[in-house]
Amino acid sequence: MSAVTLQQGDLLLNLYIQPKASRDQIVGLHGDELKVAITAPPIDGKANAHLSKYLAKTFKVPKSDIHIMKGELGRHKQIRVIDPKIIPSVITELMGQTS
């Protein structure tokens, strides 16, 4: 499965999360996954909450439109973004589109 898939208007992202990074950013491909660095530590769900907030801001959607489908407790996650308003260029490039 690819790192980024568009499915019925939603984005499916296969992510590799790097917690406790110096800043929040989409790093790029990491094998078959998209690497995302976040500043939050992987303690008591803080990294998941921070990731949801960061992705909501990045895709200009409410946090309720970010769903962790798989990987709640690990670094490897599958995320569904419901009807993203903006898709960053790093992701459109992976989808084979031009921004």
Curated annotation (Swiss-Prot):
InterPro entries: DUF167 (IPR003746), YggU-like_sf (IPR036591). The lineage of its organism: Bacteria, Pseudomonadati, Pseudomonadota, Gammaproteobacteria, Alteromonadales. GO terms for cellular component: cytoplasm. Belongs to the UPF0235 family. This is UPF0235 protein Sbal223_1335.
